[in-house]
Structures are given as C-alpha cells and as structure tokens.
C-alpha cells in the first residue's frame, strides 16, 4: 500500500511537539519506511521547505526533505491528471486549501491513505493515518 505524506507530518517529524511525540514519530517513520511505498506530493515539498526553512534555514530544510527522498520516498509531480482531479475536488469544497486538494488527488490516484491529522482530508473522502 502507498502512503502519501502531508506537510503536517513532515513538520511534526522535524519539530516534534514533545519528547513522547518524538519517540512515537520515530517508531512510526521507521515502520512506514520499511513497509510502505511513501509518496511526497510536490506541493508538500514546497510547503515543507517554506515552513521548515523559516526555522532551520533553506539549506537544512532541503537537506531534511532529501533525507526522506534518499530513504525511498518518491516525489510526485503535479501532472495534468492530478491538477484536473484537484480542481474538481476543490470545486465541491471551497473551504479546503488548494494544497490539500492536490494532496488528496495524489492519494486518490494511488488509492492511498494520507499521513496527516488534518480533517480537511475527511471532508474530501480521503482516509488518513497518524503516528499516534
């Protein structure tokens, strides 16, 4: 099964809210890296570098993203099919951010769950998992 990583997960992995969360996230990440096909939508890469880069700096944020990619996660480009599906999803849910619609479209194209605690995915009919 494929899992699509959301920006919220990558940020939680980089900046765990607590020591306990750090341990749970590390166990979860090790498990999914071994057992699952991991996909990072290109929009997640953009958001991650923007958010993490403000705290770590650009070079460190890109390096951390590359750790995921060099460990086997795939970067999913914004294809024509994904763009059209994301547009269709966002037509019905104007309250959902465009980035979440793109991430949802990637998940749908792969029949995958999204690793996120963001309820916007529920509104789009996307199943989610979280590290807890």
Regions found by a protein language model. Give the residues of each.
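Acidic active-site catalytic centers that drive phospho-/nucleotidyl reactions
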Residues: 6, 100, 118
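A generic "structured core" feature
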Residues: 23-40, 48, 53, 84, ...
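Acidic, PIN/NYN-like endoribonuclease modules and their adjacent C-terminal/linker elements
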Residues: 2, 75, 104-132
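Anion (oxyanion) recognition and catalysis
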Residues: 32-33, 69, 108, 122
């Amino acid at each position: 099964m494929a899992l699509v990583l959301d920006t919220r997960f990558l940020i939680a992995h980089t900046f765990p809210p607590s020591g306990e969360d750090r341990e749970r996230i590390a166990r979860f990440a090790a498990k999914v890296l071994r057992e699952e096909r991991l996909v990072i939508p290109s929009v997640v890469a953009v958001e991650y570098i923007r958010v993490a880069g403000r705290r770590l700096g650009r070079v460190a944020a890109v390096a951390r993203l590359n750790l995921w990619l060099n460990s086997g996660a795939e970067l999913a480009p914004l294809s024509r099919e994904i763009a059209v599906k994301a547009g269709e999803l966002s037509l019905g849910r104007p309250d959902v951010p465009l980035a979440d619609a793109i991430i949802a479209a990637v998940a749908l194209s792969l029949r995958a769950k999204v690793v996120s605690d963001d309820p916007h995915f529920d509104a789009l009919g996307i199943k989610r998992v979280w590290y807890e």
